[in-house]
Every structure is written in structure tokens, then in C-alpha cells.
């Protein structure tokens, strides 16, 4: 009987350890996904700024060349 109790205790203990390891890995994966999402948002924001600056610069250059041709 004592052998069964020890075996059951060991199985439950190992199950809890593996469960906590799985939860920790899931938590780390979620944090990595959030970091990736934040980085992609930063990249999109930066590209929008560069795109806006490019449009303004292109407009200024086209105005300069348009005035010289007249």
C-alpha cells in the first residue's frame, strides 16, 4: 500500500512539474508574439513617416522642375 502511495505521489509530482514547464513555455511564446507585434507596428509607423517625407520631397522637386521649364 505504501508503495502505491509513493508511486501515485511521484506521478502527481512529475505531472505538476511538466504542467508548470508547459505553462512557462506558453507564457514565453506569448511574450515573443507581443514583441513581434510591437516591432511590426514600429516598422509600419517608420515606413509611413518615410513615405510621407518622400511625397513631400517629390512634390517640392516637381515644383522646382516645373517652374524652370516655364
Swiss-Prot record:
The entry's keywords: Amidation, Amphibian defense peptide, Antibiotic, Antimicrobial, Cleavage on pair of basic residues, Fungicide, Hemagglutinin, Secreted, Signal
GO CC annotations, alphabetized: extracellular region
Propeptide residues, chain positions: 23-42, 66-70
One Gene Ontology term from the biological process aspect of the record: killing of cells of another organism
Phenylalanine amide: residues carrying this PTM: 65
Predominant cellular place of this UniProt entry's protein: secreted
Alphabetized Pfam families for the sequence: FSAP_sig_propep
Source taxon at top rank: Eukaryota
Subcellular location: Secreted
The keyword Secreted belongs to this UniProt entry's keyword annotation: yes
Coiled-coil boundaries: none
InterPro entries reported in the protein's UniProt record: Frog_antimicrobial_propeptide, FSAP
Family: Belongs to the frog skin active peptide (FSAP) family. Cruzioseptin subfamily.
Name of the protein in question: Cruzioseptin-1
Species this protein is from: Cruziohyla calcarifer (Splendid leaf frog)
Amino acid at each position: 500500500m505504501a508503495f502505491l502511495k509513493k508511486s501515485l505521489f511521484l506521478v502527481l509530482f512529475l505531472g505538476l512539474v511538466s504542467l508548470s514547464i508547459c505553462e512557462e513555455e506558453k507564457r514565453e511564446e506569448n511574450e515573443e508574439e507581443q514583441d513581434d507585434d510591437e516591432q511590426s507596428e514600429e516598422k509600419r509607423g517608420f515606413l509611413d513617416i518615410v513615405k510621407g517625407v518622400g511625397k513631400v520631397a517629390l512634390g517640392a522637386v516637381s515644383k522646382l522642375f516645373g517652374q524652370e521649364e516655364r
